[in-house]
Amino acid sequence: MSDINDPNSISLPVGSSCTSRGASTETFTTSRSTTLFSSQQESKDEGNVELRESITLPTINHRVLLSLKESAKVIGTKGSTIQNVREINHVKIGLSEKQLGCSDRVLSCAGRIINVAHSLGQIVSVLKEGSTVSSAEKYAFHFLNPILPPPTRDEFQDLTLDEINKIGTSRLMVTNSQLSSIIGKGGARIKSLKERHRVKIVASRDFLPDSDERILEIQGLPNAITNVLLQISKILLNELDITFASERRYYPHLRSSSPSNAVSLAASTSGVQTGASNYLNNEFKATLKIPESYVGAIAGRRGNRIANLRKFTKTKIIVEKKIDKTVIDVDPDNRTFIILGDHFKNVKLAESMLLKNLDVEIEKRKSRLAKK
């Protein structure tokens, strides 16, 4: 979010003032040269304005919750649908990785607020293609189930049946602080959004698992949802708060009541075997096998490197002690590193950084051996 100003109020620093200065400067020359200078200056000004607009127009990143079936529809054949949205609207748009056993994925869309709003409105249209009002599915993950009832003819008497069938829903993911900003004092803002754009808006009671985010369900015609998202973006950017950044975001993951139900994490890197990630009592866990010969380099002198990694990722990293020679070691070539954390993304970050450090050490060793 590079700027919190309304795009309509953006000042254009290179404009009439430069042209007037140019005109007054050229008073001492012929009228022909004045005209030439002015046209060149105007052309230069236009280029500067376009450049400044591309830099200063506010940007935003919205996240939408989708089911696996909806995700497949958004991606399209060989990624054609999502690529089309990306190219038409000039946005960065993508989906979170599939997590084993999870029925949901998160769609992220970042760019200029107008482009993001149009993109998500287009996604609503894509999801409604070939479906009807009564074709809603039921999901075990209740956040995917609609909160609002389907639209009826009584509510939209001025619309045809075909138009009513185009009414769709967007599950916008917002943090608790963002939701308060959208609702406004005494619910004034959300009421204005509903009435002005003729949409229904409701927030989920529950927070998404292990996060400070809730679902803001918006129901309406795609164009209406686009306009609502544009207004919501402006509200959030104008009330940008430090608490927005510190609130926990939701990432698809399994929750389990016993260690036997595990979430598979990333595949191995550089020959390192990655174990399962168990979620139990609000704690995520990742287990890595690091080759014994690299443990010292990964841990650092007096454990400083691993200590810095713990601090940076806000995780607990436990290095398994070397087994006594009198005990039979089932895996003498590798040492186990266990990563524990309260947040899934922190554990994933620590895991990826450990693997990256290992890759660096492997390359260093290869270089040294090549020089000998």
Curated annotation (Swiss-Prot):
**SUPFAM superfamilies the record matches:** Eukaryotic type KH-domain (KH-domain type I)
Q: How does it assemble?
A: Binds RNA.
Q: Which gene encodes it?
A: HEK2
Q: What does this protein do?
A: RNA-binding protein involved in the correct localization of transcripts in the cell. RNA localization is a widespread mechanism for achieving localized protein synthesis. Involved in structural and functional organization of telomeric chromatin and regulates silencing at the HMR locus.
Q: Does the keyword Cytoplasm apply?
A: yes
Q: Name one GO cellular component term.
A: P-body
- This protein is called Heterogeneous nuclear rnp K-like protein 2
Q: Pfam families this protein is in?
A: KH_1
Please provide the record's keywords in A-Z order. Answer: Chromatin regulator, Chromosome, Cytoplasm, mRNA transport, Nucleus, Repeat, RNA-binding, Telomere, Translation regulation, Transport
Main subcellular location of this protein, as a coarse class: cytoplasm
GO MF terms listed in the record are: RNA binding
Question: Which stretches are tagged as biased composition: Low complexity?
Answer: 24-39
Task: Using the record's annotation, list all stretches that form the KH domain.
Answer: 59-123, 167-232, 283-354
Please list where the region (Disordered) is annotated.
1-49
Give me the stretches of Polar residues compositional bias. 1-23
A single BP term in Gene Ontology: mRNA transport
Compartment(s) of residence: Cytoplasm; Cytoplasm, P-body; Nucleus; Chromosome, Telomere
Please report which protein family the annotation says this sequence is part of: Belongs to the HEK2 family.
Quote the SMART domains the UniProt record gives: KH
